[in-house]
Amino acid sequence: MKKSIFTSLYLQVLVAITIGILLGHFYPDLGTQMKPLGDGFVKLIKMIIAPVIFCTVVTGIAGMESMKAVGRTGAIALLYFEVVSTIALIIGLVVVNILQPGVGMNVDPNALDTKAVAVYADQAAQQGIVAFLLDVIPSSVIGAFASGNILQVLLFAVMFGFALHHLGEKGQLIFNVIDSFAKVIFGVINMIMKLAPIGAFGAMAFTIGKYGVGTLVQLGQLILCFYITCALFVVLVLGSIAKATGFSIFRFIAYIKEELLIVLGTSSSESALPRMLDKMEKVGCQKSVVGLVIPTGYSFNLDGTSIYLTMAAVFIAQATNAQMDIWHQVTLLVVLLLSSKGAAGVTGSGFIVLAATLSAVGHLPVAGLALILGIDRFMSEARALTNLIGNGVATIVVAKRCRQLNEKQMNAVLGGRDSALRDPIA
């Protein structure tokens, strides 16, 4: 029996977002009161992220024939992340220099109210490469799961998977238990996703109700430049990578349209992580590749965040008339190559990394963060959407490079033009 269009999660979330925008615009006070709906949905998603990553990574690694393949997958993924995120940083830098959205604003940094950004500056002071690397190691396994730290859970899951693999037949019972537990967890995910329209409605109503459409108009040029840049990056850069890998970026976007709408409503790519793990397996990527690439990409492959960081930093310099010659911009790029890896796929993380970057560069006024604080919530949506698409493309690319991609299945799912591609897994 053909399913009704009204049962489509895609349509339900789209309608919910539209209603949320209207409510927030016409009844802003009521709209801001809808915040708990969005927060509640995101908390439900975060509740199951740690067990999903653990189960996916452990069963993926333990089920592989060779441990060398795991190391090769990780190395290829990290190399891909570094190259593509660097391209994203450079594109953001080039576009903001060409369009110059901040030129002519002539803002005095000393006149800005920095109270609102003080909390971000304080968090940014805690950022650092050594601190970031040490934070990957959990103080306790229970603590890693309790805090929902993706990289900490991933580290433990990889070690657990290796140990389980070395047990061989003795570990089969544990493997079966974890595999069965994973099926239960994905059942829980399906239950939670039925609440996605409510969560998207609440988050969008709050955003529009609190910040208003007027905020968009006030600094609309920067927002427009950023959205255009993200769109160009997805179509041109990720599109070219997708084409070289054997699939269409537009078909892939259509394939993950429900996840994209959930991200649009919540402004966090993390909210779609559990479903992305499942969908990337269904598109033909081996579980071991999906389990490594997707969670790692949430800290090392945030293309949208990379574009945002360079554009926002230079915009602040332009708006406050801070000097930014070619060497200052090269310094900014080098700093961002490191600091951008500390961002996670959660709302607000990009703003914290931006604060850390301004502090590290030195000659850019941290007070300038106050300029974009009001519109950061709107820009975070484009960041999250680009991050999600980028991590999905990365998974397919790495899977193909590691010969862990069922290309026949990929073409069947995405409707690719070449249905006669070989199946390297079979």
UniProtKB/Swiss-Prot annotation:
GO terms for molecular function: fumarate transmembrane transporter activity; malate:proton symporter activity; succinate transmembrane transporter activity. PANTHER family: AEROBIC C4-DICARBOXYLATE TRANSPORT PROTEIN, PROTON/GLUTAMATE-ASPARTATE SYMPORTER. Keywords: Cell inner membrane, Cell membrane, Membrane, Symport, Transmembrane, Transmembrane helix, Transport. Belongs to the dicarboxylate/amino acid:cation symporter (DAACS) (TC 2.A.23) family. Responsible for the transport of dicarboxylates such as succinate, fumarate, and malate from the periplasm across the membrane. The keyword Transmembrane applies. GO terms for cellular component: plasma membrane. The keyword Cytoplasm does not apply. The chain crosses the membrane at residues 4-24, 44-64, 76-96, 142-162, 184-204, 222-242, 326-346, 352-372. The gene is dctA. GO terms for biological process: L-aspartate transmembrane transport. It is found in: Cell inner membrane. It is a multi-pass membrane protein. This is C4-dicarboxylate transport protein. It comes from the Bacteria. It comes from Edwardsiella ictaluri (strain 93-146).
